[in-house]
Amino acid sequence: MLCVNVELRERSYPIHIGMGLLSEAQVYPLKKGDKVMIVTNPTIAQYYLSSVTDTLEKIGCSVENVQLPEGEQYKTLESLDLIFTALLKANHGRDTSIIALGGGVIGDIAGYAAASYQRGVRFIQIPTTLLAQVDSSVGGKTAVNHKLGKNMIGAFYQPCAVIIDTLTLTTLPKREIHAGLAEVIKYGAILDDEFFTWLEKHITNLVALEQQYLQQCIARCCQIKADVVTRDETEKGERALLNLGHTFGHAIETHLGYGNWLHGEAVATGMMIAAILSNKLGDLSLNDVTRLEKLLIQADLPTASPDTMKAEDYLPHMMRDKKVLAGKLRLVLLKSLGQAYVATDTDKEYVLDAIRTCSKKS
């Protein structure tokens, strides 16, 4: 088992990474008599709910669960209310613990429920998708979507532990594995050129879910994110770099309708647009743009803007991005692979030109 620590003084917590951890009682920060509400969905429940429940009951916990509809389109206030209703009906108090058992959607909703219920209860992340394991389960971002924008209603709320059982990836559809690799590639692109080079060598090992490479990769991604979160928990500066491709990607998700493109797929195309824009602004070399595109293609990810979106369709969504300040668009761009920066007030004609260039690739 590997362990990465997120250092936030009294709110520090471990990220446990290994095979078969769902059944390992010692990784759960719980004790006899604790009340637990597991938030999951029907698909994940059929694979893993009994394993987690059995382990918690052996510890001596009282365990209940609530199962939410599946998919990004259900990351809503209505789903949040289902959690609150389940907690209240079962008389859960401020001493309860909420466990998110699922992917990024479940983690985001359950985390926001934990932040909100009776002004905050204990929260444990058990991410079961690659995207959630390397990204959304770490760092304390919780949210639900609004019809006008993704993740517009939420809070920063740290878990007390993240438990990553890499065996859960064996039941994921291949499309979900590929989508998760977009966030993996992002880490190399923004902050770690050596990791990017490692990915170029081992992307096929990751696609094949070879455990040795998978655990090493997940640990590296978690360490990069943990270091950034330690330095900038609430995204006042450096943490914004973790959003490479996300401003464009969120525009794609919102415009097409949540769930039509997976988050990682939209981020992959968003990274390509950001790379093309960086090149047009004179920063990123054409060779680095090509390397990024090649790696995304090897991960079976889209690198072209959707056929049904015009360049002009992006801007209204992008102007609602949380990084916009004083009405000015702020974008995460690249100077080189491994070196990202936040560009302020980029000329919109350059942005539109980059999107159009990415559209021509389809």
Curated annotation (Swiss-Prot):
Pfam families: DHQ_synthase, DHQS_C. Its EC number is 4.2.3.4. Binds 1 divalent metal cation per subunit. Can use either Co(2+) or Zn(2+). Pathway: Metabolic intermediate biosynthesis; chorismate biosynthesis; chorismate from D-erythrose 4-phosphate and phosphoenolpyruvate: step 2/7. It is found in: Cytoplasm. GO terms for molecular function: 3-dehydroquinate synthase activity; metal ion binding; nucleotide binding. The keyword Cytoplasm applies. It comes from the Bacteria. Zn(2+) binds at residues 183, 246, 263. NAD(+) binds at residues 70-75, 104-108, 128-129, 141, 150, 168-171. Its cofactor is Co(2+); Zn(2+); NAD(+). It is an enzyme of class 4 (lyase). Catalyzes the conversion of 3-deoxy-D-arabino-heptulosonate 7-phosphate (DAHP) to dehydroquinate (DHQ). Belongs to the sugar phosphate cyclases superfamily. Dehydroquinate synthase family. NCBIfam families: aroB. This is 3-dehydroquinate synthase. It comes from Histophilus somni (strain 129Pt). The lineage of its organism: Bacteria, Pseudomonadati, Pseudomonadota, Gammaproteobacteria, Pasteurellales. The gene is aroB.
